[in-house]
Regions:
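A short beta-loop-alpha structural element at the N-terminal edge
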Residues: 15-28
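Acetyl-CoA-dependent GNAT
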Residues: 49-97, 102-106
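Conserved GNAT acetyl-CoA-binding A-motif
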Residues: 119, 126-136
Length: 136
């Protein structure tokens, strides 16, 4: 799935929302560590095992080439301010209508409408991929 949009946040900052690509791998991992240390409401803590840079590159490449999954990044001042995505739950008849949604926003950008916009983008992508159920 492909996505690209330039938006203006509530404070007037310009933000580019686009697919994450392989060259974003290090910045994506840095964003993971940052945001997972800013709140207890994400799935893991920053010190729990995550992806290596090659694994993150592969993950972003797979999402970019997928027809039913996506990983988007929000870029502000050349840095990742947020990430969000949808991943299929399964490929069996009983699960292929379901997708998981995940999102993380740098606390510096909370309250500016970025999370709302990225959530709307992921919901639209899920609908386009014919998912009937989106799970947080």
């Amino acid at each position: 799935m492909d996505y690209f949009e330039i938006i203006t946040l509530k404070d007037g900052l310009k933000c580019c929302i686009r697919n994450g690509v392989e060259r974003d791998a290090q910045a994506a991992l840095d964003h993971f560590l940052l945001t997972h240390g800013q709140t207890n409401y994400l799935l893991t803590y920053p010190d729990e095992p995550g992806f290596s840079i090659p694994q993150e590159c592969q993950y972003l490449k797979e999402k970019r080439n997928s027809k039913r999954e996506i990983e988007i990044v929000a870029i502000i001042d050349r840095k990742i301010a947020g990430m969000a995505g949808i991943n299929t739950v399964g490929s069996t008849e009983k699960t292929r209508h379901r997708a998981e949604f995940g999102i993380s926003i740098d606390k510096k950008y909370w309250g500016l409408g970025l999370g709302w916009k990225m959530t709307k983008v992921c919901i639209a992508c899920a609908r386009a991929a014919n998912y009937q159920q989106l799970e947080l």
